[in-house]
Amino acid sequence: MQNKIVKIGNIDVANDKPFVLFGGMNVLESRDMAMQVCESYVKVTEKLGVPYVFKASFDKANRSSIHSYRGPGMEEGLKIFQELKDTFGVKIITDVHEIYQCQPVADVVDIIQLPAFLARQTDLVEAMAKTGAVINVKKPQFLSPSQMGNIVEKIEECGNDKIILCDRGTNFGYDNLIVDMLGFSVMKKASKGSPVIFDVTHSLQCRDPFGAASSGRRAQVTELARSGLAVGIAGLFLEAHPNPNQAKCDGPSALPLSALEGFVFQMKAIDDLVKSFPELDTSI
């Protein structure tokens, strides 16, 4: 199977290319924090030679509680994204939840993301595809890896083949997620070689059965990310925060920003090693 390459400016995203770090924060909390977080990622990735795309949401439209922080909204969020691009020269990925958001967001950012809970909403998928932007499809927690091929087909039928697939864990009973490492290769096959990336921090979520906010397993972020890269994938999707305990969303799963350089150093070493190996033919 030939690996497809999705180009984001001068960045090549492919399962056999050096891994791309899609990193940032869960949701835009303020302009100043976005600048701080983006600058930290840029410094680390430039120092270590890792291709980088900034990620954050302008609206967390699927929060469990109506009282939970959602973000600054599309208009203010796009202003912040544009300032980040102008200041740091970064590529940006963000998610959309409504059809009317697709084109305005695609006019500013470089990748638009299809949220996991909305991945089978055909009208939204078609509207995103018709922008011509690169699309990152989050695998729903309730969907098998092989079923991602149907979502890819919807996008391609609209004339867009710039598709990235992202695993963010699978439901394991109630209120828990696991990551099936065999699923990455299944998604590659189902999409005929599309780049597959791994959302490591969201995969660490744990639900409180009777609460509105998720808890998380931040202490295991390194071992889970190592495992994903060992399979041979196109990139990691990561959230970091200056003070995770005060984050407005998913702090228990976020990497402390102070640990970012050590984390990326380890991930690059693993990715370089894995992709230096020849592919073994195990067929009979």
Curated annotation (Swiss-Prot):
Catalytic activity annotation: D-arabinose 5-phosphate + phosphoenolpyruvate + H2O = 3-deoxy-alpha-D-manno-2-octulosonate-8-phosphate + phosphate
Main localization of the protein described in the UniProt heading: cytoplasm
Enzyme class, broadest EC rank: transferase
Pathway in which this enzyme or protein is active: Carbohydrate biosynthesis; 3-deoxy-D-manno-octulosonate biosynthesis; 3-deoxy-D-manno-octulosonate from D-ribulose 5-phosphate: step 2/3; Bacterial outer membrane biogenesis; lipopolysaccharide biosynthesis
GO MF terms, alphabetically ordered: 3-deoxy-8-phosphooctulonate synthase activity
Record bears the keyword Cytoplasm: yes
GO cellular component: cytoplasm
Entry's localization field: Cytoplasm
Top-level taxon in the UniProt lineage: Bacteria
Any single GO BP term: keto-3-deoxy-D-manno-octulosonic acid biosynthetic process
E.C. no: 2.5.1.55
The keyword Cytoplasm is annotated on this UniProt entry: yes
Keywords, comma-separated and alphabetical: Cytoplasm, Lipopolysaccharide biosynthesis, Transferase
Signal peptide boundaries: none
Cross-referenced InterPro entries: Aldolase_TIM, DAHP1/KDSA, KDO8P_synthase
Record NCBIfam families: KDO8P_synth, PRK05198.1, PRK12457.1
Alphabetized HAMAP family for the sequence: KDO8P_synth
Family statement: Belongs to the KdsA family.
Designated name of the protein: 2-dehydro-3-deoxyphosphooctonate aldolase
Species: Haemophilus influenzae (strain PittEE)
Designated gene of the protein: kdsA
